[in-house]
Design a protein with these regions (language model features):
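Hydrophobic transmembrane helix segments
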Residues: 11-54
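N-terminal membrane topogenic signal
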Residues: 1-10, 124, 128
């Protein structure tokens, strides 16, 4: 599960960094999604904050449990992976409904949706 540790660190630290730079407003305008300053779209984006922070918290907690050889790490990792998948899926569904196919927003969300699938299957197989 060494590779899962790498994915969790990239994803969880990445989410925390994304929200910090979003909060302080240093994302260059060229990287902002279409209609970023529309209050409804801004609210939609901020609605992901609690979900993304839960992903980071559960992922990092899972790594802590794993390092202590605590068997609960698998359950916490599964929670983090399912939340990560949901986060990517929700964003891609939104962009699809809007017919907005900006690769700079699609790639990160495809990553969030696809990488967890492998580990979800792996963890479920280990439990049975």
């Amino acid at each position: 599960m060494k590779s899962l540790r790498i994915f969790f660190l990239i994803t969880d630290i990445g989410f925390i960094l994304y929200w910090v730079i979003t909060l302080i407003g240093v994302i260059p305008a060229s990287y902002l999604f279409k209609d970023y300053h529309n209050p409804i779209l801004s609210a939609w984006n901020w609605s992901f904050l609690p979900l993304d922070l839960m992903i980071s918290f559960s992922g990092l907690w899972s790594l802590r449990l794993m390092s202590k050889e605590d068997a609960r790490w698998k359950n916490v990792a599964l929670i983090s992976l399912v939340l990560t998948f949901a986060s990517g899926l929700m964003a891609l569904a939104f962009w699809s409904i809007r017919r907005d196919f900006d690769i700079s927003w699609w790639l990160p969300n495809l990553y969030l949706m696809l990488y967890p699938v492998y580990y979800i299957v792996l963890l479920i197989k280990q439990k049975t």
